[in-house]
Amino acid sequence: DESKSLSEHILECAKEMNNKVHTYAEENQLEHMGTTFAGIVFGKNEISIGNVGDSRIYKVRNGKIEQLSVDHVLPEELKSFKNIITQYVGMGEEEKEFSPALSTEEYCNGDRYIICSDGLTEKLNDEEVGVLCHVAQSVTDASDILVSQALGQESNDNITVIVCELEELTS
């Protein structure tokens, strides 16, 4: 449906994923089953992002990193309850309002975007992620370097990293 915005498409997909995971968990008597979600949709002049949980989306522009996603985690003062997320795919609508974080922004030629699981960000801080992504020769190299650096710090969590770069199309 072309009348929908990119953000509306992301929201629709996230709600559908949430309902399917929640239904599967209920049908199979699996308590607290869920997952995180982070995604980007590229439009003609802008991107829309959406996320649920603590998987992140970053933008690296001219060597500077910016977190675009929102972490759905307990506030700082409750951090002793580690790894508790306040939103996740599969939580169902009746538990609490399922509310993916959504945003839209313009992009520039050369921007690199990183989608990653918390396995990466538990071992590398934002600045380290930004520098490693910026200096890598290609997006494949950037992904490989980021995963390698996190694994080198003995991460026990799964590590998922996707890096993409926007290039101006020439005809």
Locations of the language-model features?
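PP2C/PPM-type serine/threonine phosphatase catalytic domain
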Residues: 1-171
